[in-house]
Each structure stands twice: as C-alpha cells, then as structure tokens.
From Swiss-Prot:
Statement: the UniProt record of this protein carries the keyword Glycosyltransferase: no
Main location: membrane
PROSITE patterns membership: CUB, LDLRA_1, LDLRA_2
Known function: Involved in the development and/or maintenance of neuronal circuitry. Accessory subunit of the neuronal N-methyl-D-aspartate receptor (NMDAR) critical for maintaining the abundance of GRIN2A-containing NMDARs in the postsynaptic density. Regulates long-term NMDA receptor-dependent synaptic plasticity and cognition, at least in the context of spatial learning and memory.
Outcome of gene disruption: Depressed long-term potentiation (LTP) at Schaffer collateral-CA1 synapses, NMDAR-dependent spatial learning and memory. Rescued by the ampakine CX546 at physiological doses.
Subunit structure: Interacts with PLZ domains of DLG2, DLG3 and DLG4 via its C-terminal TRV domain. Interacts with GRIN2A and GRIN2B via its CUB domains.
Residues bearing PTM Phosphotyrosine: 417
GO cellular component: axon cytoplasm; excitatory synapse; glutamatergic synapse; postsynaptic density; postsynaptic density membrane; Schaffer collateral - CA1 synapse; synapse
Protein name as annotated: Neuropilin and tolloid-like protein 1
Length: 533
C-alpha cells in the first residue's frame, strides 16, 4: 500500500512538471522580436585593467523578457578572465533552457561556446583563449530572480610569454573619405607609422558623405599566418570601433565584401612581429539608396554611386554595371598607360623583326638570280656560233646553161653538208653523242673530227689531173667564210680553178674536193673570189 502511494506521488509530480514545462515553452514562443533585442543592458564599467557589468536592476529582480549581450575585448597579446564572485541567482531549469547566462570564446554569437549557467550556484572562473568574450543574458516572461554581477580583468596571453616584456604598440590611425578610396596596409610603412619589424594595430576611419552608406570590396588579401587570428587579422566595424559594432573579422585565406549600414566604417589590422608580411587592399565606395539623383549612377543592386565613378577602371558596384560598356575607353586608357620605356622597346623590337623579314626575302630572291647571272657570264657565244648560226652558202648565177648538171652536183653536195651540220649541232658536248675525243674548242672540233674520220676510212687514191673540156661554159663560185682548223691542210691554190666536165667525178674525188673547199672557206672571212674555169 505504501509503495502504491509513493508511485502515485511520483507520477503526479511528473505530470505537474510536464505541464509547467509546456507553459514555459508556450510563454517562450510568445516573446516578440521587439523584446529580444541583442543590445547591451544593465550597468557597465570599463577601464584599462578590467571592468564590471551586471544584469538589469541588480541586486533587485531582473525584468522579464529581456536579452542582453556583453562583448569584452582585450588589448593585443592579452586574454580575459571572468569572475562571478557576487551574489548570484537565476531561475533554475533543465539544461538552463529558460533564464540563463551564455558565454562564448570569441566576439560573435557563433563563436565556440564555453558554457551556459543558471540556478543558485555561482559559475566557475572563465578564461578566454584570445582577446574576446561574448556574454548573453536571457530572461523569459516568468519567474524572475536577482540576477548576477560579473567582474573581468586582462592577463598576458600565454602564447606570447616567450617574447618577454613587449614594447607598447605605436599609434597608428588614418582618416579617409569621399565618393571612393583605397585602404591598404602599405600605408603603414609609407607614412612611417611603424617599422617593418614592429607589431601593428592600425585603424582606418572612413566617413561617407551625408545620407550615404559604405560598400567595401577587397582587391588584395593575404594573411601570413592563416587561421591564426591571435597573430594577424583584418576586422571591419560598422558605426564605431567598439567591439559591439564589429561587423566582420578575417584571418583565414578568404575575405568577402562587406556592406555597411552606416556612413562610418572602421578597418582594423592586427599583425604581430612574425606576421608583418600580412597585407590587404580594400576599395571603399560611398553610395545612396534609390531613388537615384541626377548626378548618380544606378547600379541595379539598390546602389546609387557618383557619376565620376563610371568607367574609371574600378568596379564600384556590387556587380560590374559601371564598367560594362567602357570597352573603347579601356583601350584608350591602356595605350595611355604605356610608359616611354615600354613603348621604345616595342618599337625597336618591331623594327628589328621587319628588317630581318625584308633581308630574308631579298636573300631568297637574289640567290637563284645570282646563279643564273653567273652561268650567263660564263657563256661564250662564239663557241656556239656554229650551232645557233650555221653558215650559209649561196651559189652564183650560171653564165650558161651547159653546166646545169655539174652545178646540180655541187648544190647537192652543199645541201648534204648543211643537213650534216644541223644534225651535228644538236650535240653541244662530246659525251652527248658518244664521242671519245676531247674537244678543245667546244662544238667546232666535233665537225672536224667527223670529217677527219670519214677521210681516214677512205683509202687514198692518186688524184688524176683534169683536162679542161672544150666548149664548156664557166661558172661563178661564191665562197663564204667558216672557221675550221682542219682546212689548214689544204692549199687554196689547188682548188682555185675547178674545171667542170661533162663526166662525173668519182665519189672519192668529190669528197676530197668538198673537204678542201670547206677548209678554204674558213681561212678567208667574208671574202668573195671569182674564179674562172
């Protein structure tokens, strides 16, 4: 019976707890967005050594439906220690789902969580791993309590303990403004804010014109020690340099564009002594929201930028609307940007290439022409005169009709000789015709050798003296010069007078007379003799 009653009480307690939890959840869902504003609330004191912050109305009960966010920032190379050593009371719940304090190791609500606390027991001492702590206090609409009081201070970062006592950081701040501008880390060295071996913590304050906002776009970004935010980072603040206005922080390998909601932007760069090679370059553009005024350009992304930024070679809009129709201007600007040195180098190189091409073409044209001219200069026209201009023989008119038969024989002999010369003229060189004799004077010796071979084959016979016939008419013989060395062996006197007879001479006698006649013609150049028989 006792066990039955105990079991009944346990079941009843569970039902009550469940119903109360459902009521809490329904109340939590009824909280409006206006009551859940992530803003700082309660008391806050800050100084170089630390500070104190509390829940609203502490040590009285905190009001319902409240959400307060506190961000603590330490100096470079320092960490944060957080203490809850005063009276403390927050509504208890399972896993602190209702009223609670949430602490994260970093500057954002998505930073790694350290813990969530509620109830009557004070939280332990909390230490950050870096320069920031993010603390949120949340209260639902029921069961309020006294709240909390927290104290914090700064301690040296253990990651830098090997460096000993560090020098104070140099003052490093810049002021910029206007429709656009470039923020770059190289300004630190250019303006002598710090040396190349010093750690830097620099800030750039950007102020836009009235009723304008700021758009930031990275042109260059590189961290020497990527993913080590303690050693180097670039941070963007919207409205002030306070940690509550931290918009974005980059310490990895990628940096995204940032759109600010106010007209004041702060860029902060931190780099220790071993990260001075970290660099960035950022373009800021002041813009207004539509409707655009007359002296502005609409970027099709709810941005109105100054007309002077259109086609200036830089993308000032989120998308490159301001540079899309500037091809001609880009070409002109590219030529204008060529320095005198580069222009000279390009001009000289082009001239050298053109000269080499011209010389190469001339050489290719002249080389075969040279060979042709050389061969033409070696050509001796007298050597081939007998080939191209064979001699002409003309017969004189007859003084009578009685010697027609004898004269026909002479004409036939000359005609045969012409045919022989034409056929032999086709062989310019001895080896073309198979001759075994070498020629000292070109084709002239070919004919002499042929005639000599004919005479060599014919046996020599004594020449019978010719008796001049009676009652025979005289004929006129015209002799034309033809150079022939082989004719030197004949005596012209022996053939000066050639009697014409009615009887036929023997074939051998005709050959001898024909050979001597040709030889004599070669001795007397362009000479005409009249011989009366």
């Amino acid at each position: 019976m006792i066990y039955g009653r105990s079991l009944f009480h346990i079941i009843a307690s569970l039902i009550i707890l469940h119903s109360s939890g459902a009521t809490k959840k329904g109340t939590e869902k009824q909280i409006t967005p206006e009551t859940q504003k992530s803003v700082q609330c309660g008391t806050w004191t800050k100084h170089a050594e630390g500070g104190v912050f509390t829940s609203p109305n502490y040590p009285s009960k905190y009001p319902p439906d409240r959400e307060c966010v506190y961000i603590i920032e330490a100096a470079p190379r320092q960490c944060i220690e957080l203490y809850f050593d005063e009276k403390y009371s927050i509504e208890p719940s399972w896993e602190c789902k209702f009223d609670h304090i949430e602490v994260r190791d970093g500057p954002f609500g998505f930073s790694p969580i350290i813990g969530r606390f509620c109830g009557q027991q004070n939280p332990p001492v909390i230490k950050s791993s870096g320069r920031f702590l993010w603390i949120k206090f949340f209260a639902d609409g029921e069961l309020e309590s006294m709240g909390f009081s927290a104290r914090y201070n700064f301690t040296p970062d253990p990651d830098f303990k090997d460096l000993g006592v560090l020098k104070p950081l140099p003052a490093c701040e810049f002021e910029m403004g206007g429709p656009e501008g470039i923020v770059e880390s190289i300004q630190i060295l250019k303006e002598g804010k710090a040396s190349a071996s010093e750690a830097v913590d620099c800030k750039w304050y950007i102020r836009a014109p009235p009723r304008s906002k700021i758009y930031l776009r990275f042109l260059d970004y590189e961290m020497q020690n990527s993913n080590e935010c303690k050693r180097n980072f670039v941070a963007v603040y919207d409205g002030s340099s306070s940690v509550e206005d931290l918009k974005a922080k980059f310490c990895s390998t990628v940096a995204n564009d940032v759109m600010l909601r106010t007209g004041l932007g702060v860029i902060r760069m931190w780099a220790d002594e071993g990260s001075r090679n970290s660099r960035f370059q950022m373009l800021f553009t002041s813009f207004q929201e539509p409707p655009c005024e007359g002296n502005t350009f609409f970027c099709h992304s709810n941005m109105c930028i100054n007309n002077t930024l259109v086609c200036n070679g830089l993308q000032n809009c989120v998308y490159p609307w301001d540079e899309n129709h500037c091809k001609e201007k880009r070409k002109t600007s590219l030529l204008d940007q060529l320095t005198n040195t580069s222009g000279t180098v390009i001009g000289v190189t082009s001239c050298i290439v053109i000269i080499l091409i011209i010389v190469s073409v001339i050489v290719q044209i002249k080389q075969p022409r040279k060979k042709y001219v050389q061969r033409k200069s070696d050509f001796d026209q007298t050597v081939f005169q007998e080939v191209f201009e064979p001699p002409h023989y003309e017969l004189c008119t007859l003084r009578g009709t009685g010697a027609t038969a004898d004269f026909a024989d002479v004409a036939e002999d000359f005609e045969n000789y012409h045919k022989l010369r034409r056929s032999s003229s086709k062989c310019i060189h001895d080896h073309h015709c198979g001759s075994q004799l070498s020629s000292a004077k070109g084709s002239r010796s070919n004919l002499s050798t042929r005639d000599a071979s004919i005479l060599a084959e014919i046996p020599t016979q004594p020449v019978k003296p010719l008796i001049p016939p009676v009652n025979r008419r005289n004929i006129l013989v015209m002799k034309h010069n033809y150079s022939q060395d082989a004719a030197d062996a004949c005596d012209i006197d022996e053939i000066e007078e050639v009697p014409t007879t009615s009887h036929r001479l023997s074939r051998h006698e005709k050959s001898v007379q024909r050979f001597c006649l040709i030889g004599s013609l070669s001795k007397h150049e362009s000479e005409y003799n009249t011989t009366r028989v």
